[in-house]
Amino acid sequence: MKATIWHNPRCGTSRKTLAILEETPGVEVTVIEYLKTPPTREELLRLYARAGMTPRDGLRAKEPLAAEMGLLNADDATILDAMMAHPILIERPLVETDKGVKLCRPQEKVREIL
């Protein structure tokens, strides 16, 4: 099985999710450090659609920049625009497999798509 993780190595939950993926037999992991290689708008919308999420659901609301930019009460298009300009606003880790996409918070959620 192939799995892709949009990963931030500075995030403990992201590191723990990656460890679960790497320790699971038969899983071939692709790691994308999304702060260095952000997803495109279309890619992020596709991931959210597969996960049953909206951009608001994928907003890293506790990131100070979210409040500074007035995103806590913004519409999805505004949130998505901000995510494209500032990828730190994308909540992580997102994991995609053949079985679906999950925002893996807590990290054990990744097991639902393995």
What are these regions (language model features)?
Residues 1-24, 28-34:
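Local sequence-structure signature of Cys/Sec-based thiol-disulfide redox active-site neighborhoods
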Residues 34-114:
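Thiol/selenol-based redox catalytic cores and closely related redox-interacting motifs
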